[in-house]
Amino acid sequence: MSQDGVQWCRVWVTMLLLLPSAPVEGGELRLMRSVLISLQRVQAASKTEQEILDLPPGARPALYCSNKCTLRDWCQLWCAYPSNTPTHCLVSNIIVMPTYQETNMGDVLTCHTTRPKDLATNTNITAGKHYVPNPLRVKENLVDGFYNYDLNQCFYTEWSDNDTWFTLDFGQPKSFQHVILYAQVNRNAKKHFNNVQVRVSNVTAVTPPEDFAAYDLFGEFPGEASPGQVVEMKSPKPMCARFVTGHMLHIYLFQVCHIEVF
């Protein structure tokens, strides 16, 4: 493969936090990462459960709440609050990436997310025109590190096949092995997420979307997505690339609700 093309590279090394998160008496470990998020956002999630902390002497709130999250297969985030002297435990299905940047600091909590540290959050993004009748569904929603299963947090393109795409630019080659795309949660997912390709490259950005074929194919989803489907594409080895593109080949309005690259 040419020097400017995609290259295999060494595994990206990071420090991860391991928190006990099985039944309290158990020993299972689960990866958790701390993140700041507004209490209001957590409470507004499509699914959040709250429990009063009723702990025996010497028990740790963090262990209790982590355990509550682990026992729910839909849980993506947990918080013990108030943070200084917690009396409650929140578990939620809200997607919050570890590098999410909270803007509402008035009621901020230190929470713990199950999501991995990724490259898409806060990176540069270009894309086709968004669908004007839905002004909130802009490309920036894909890189803000936050998703609450609300359609207005998705990116929605115009109908033209010249617009059914997005490109992430990391600024320099980065190592990753997974690209994950979230389809919308309703039955129209089959129309708006249909025949999607992901391509990667280190070369100078090309003219989208007609020149995307010059990039290396990372993965593809040839069918129609089901409501809320999470599409994970995985390379057999970690690889290095600067650009990641997503392109729907089916000519219709393209909608993606969340992206992770790690």
Q: Which residues make up each language-model segment?
A:
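Conserved small-residue hotspots that stabilize compact domain segments
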Residues: 5-76, 155
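Extracellular/luminal ectodomains of metazoan preproproteins built from arrays
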Residues: 25-38, 95-130, 260-262
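Intrinsic-disorder/low-complexity, polar/charged segments enriched in Ser/Thr/Lys/Arg/Asp/Glu/Gln
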Residues: 50, 163-167, 175-178, 230
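Short, conserved beta-strand segments of beta-strand-rich sandwich/propeller modules, principally
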Residues: 66, 88, 241-245
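Disulfide-stabilized extracellular beta-strand modules
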Residues: 77-98, 194-195
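Conserved beta-strand elements of beta-rich interaction domains across eukaryotes
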Residues: 84-86, 95-97, 132, 172-175, ...
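Disordered, acidic Ser/Thr/Pro-rich linker "stalks" and the adjacent N-terminal cap
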Residues: 111-173, 184-191, 220
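Trp- and acidic/polar-enriched beta-sheet ligand-binding modules for extracellular glycan
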Residues: 159-165, 186-262
